[in-house]
């Protein structure tokens, strides 16, 4: 990545800065990290902007490896029809949303999409169960019993389901998140 052909143009950098919450330095670092995942023959700027990286490769990044929602994060940000890879722009979008400077509304919108495992626009009991299992782990010693899970989900819905339809929609989720001062600072990935 040392040659002059391996740097993003000033125009492209400016465009990415306008479209994301990232600084010029963060964009350059993101490009370098993305290119490290590409085969050497695809590391030119032109190739890197048109080559997709598999989830397997993206998930090898230390910043994502330990995240319990790593697969969902990749799926939500992938523009691939098969949702199995990320382009550089997908990768930038991901990093932008998880940056310190992204707005709480943007962060909560994407958190909702990540937690909506069945992509139906609501968090139902199954989504909430999967969310809890991701957070607690699915090992014998950490997994909640069926009655504990039911009680926890009942409590979550009691607190969050304002319209009492048995699910949490985006506005209900954002209302709950707005009362959580640590959410925005904990919803981040730093390269």
Swiss-Prot record:
Pfam families: EF-hand_7. SUPFAM superfamilies: EF-hand. This is Calcium and integrin-binding protein 1. It is found in: Membrane; Cell membrane, Sarcolemma; Cell membrane; Apical cell membrane. The binding of either calcium or magnesium significantly increases the structural stability of the protein in comparison to apo-CIB (calcium- and magnesium-free form). GO terms for molecular function: calcium ion binding; calcium-dependent protein kinase inhibitor activity; magnesium ion binding; protein kinase binding; protein serine/threonine kinase inhibitor activity; protein-membrane adaptor activity; small GTPase binding; transmembrane transporter binding. Expressed in cardiomyocytes and neurons (at protein level). Expressed during early neural development. Calcium-binding protein that plays a role in the regulation of numerous cellular processes, such as cell differentiation, cell division, cell proliferation, cell migration, thrombosis, angiogenesis, cardiac hypertrophy and apoptosis. Involved in bone marrow megakaryocyte differentiation by negatively regulating thrombopoietin-mediated signaling pathway. Participates in the endomitotic cell cycle of megakaryocyte, a form of mitosis in which both karyokinesis and cytokinesis are interrupted. GO terms for biological process: angiogenesis; apoptotic process; cell adhesion; cell division; cellular response to growth factor stimulus; cellular response to nerve growth factor stimulus; cellular response to tumor necrosis factor; cytoplasmic microtubule organization. SMART domains: EFh. A lipid is attached at residue 2 (N-myristoyl glycine). Ca(2+) 2 binds at residues 161, 163, 165, 167, 172. It comes from the Eukaryota. The EF-hands may also bind magnesium ions in the presence of high Mg(2+) levels and low Ca(2+) levels. Ca(2+) 1 binds at residues 116, 118, 120, 122, 127. Residues 103-138, 148-183 form the EF-hand domain. The keyword Heme does not apply. Signal peptide: none annotated. It comes from Rattus norvegicus. Its main location: membrane. Keywords: Angiogenesis, Apoptosis, Calcium, Cell adhesion, Cell cycle, Cell division, Cell membrane, Cell projection, Cytoplasm, Cytoskeleton, Differentiation, Lipoprotein, Magnesium, Membrane, Metal-binding, Myristate, Nucleus, Repeat, Spermatogenesis.
């Amino acid at each position: 990545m040392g040659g002059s052909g391996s740097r993003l143009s000033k125009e492209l950098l400016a465009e990415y800065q306008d479209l994301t919450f990232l600084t010029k330095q963060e964009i350059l670092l993101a490009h370098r990290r993305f290119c490290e995942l590409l085969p050497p023959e695809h590391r030119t700027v032109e190739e890197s902007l048109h080559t997709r990286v598999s989830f397997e490769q993206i998930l090898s990044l230390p910043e994502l490896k330990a995240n319990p929602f790593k697969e969902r994060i990749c799926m939500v940000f992938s523009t691939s029809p098969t949702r199995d890879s990320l382009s550089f722009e997908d990768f930038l979008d991901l990093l932008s949303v998880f940056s310190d400077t992204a707005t709480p509304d943007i962060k909560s919108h994407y958190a909702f999409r990540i937690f909506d495992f069945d992509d139906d626009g609501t968090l139902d009991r199954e989504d909430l169960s999967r969310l809890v299992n991701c957070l607690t782990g699915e090992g014998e010693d950490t997994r909640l019993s069926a009655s504990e899970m039911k009680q926890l989900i009942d409590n979550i819905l009691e607190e969050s389901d304002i319209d009492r339809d048995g699910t949490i929609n985006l506005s209900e989720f954002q209302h709950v998140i707005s009362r959580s001062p640590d959410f925005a600072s904990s919803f981040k990935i730093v390269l």
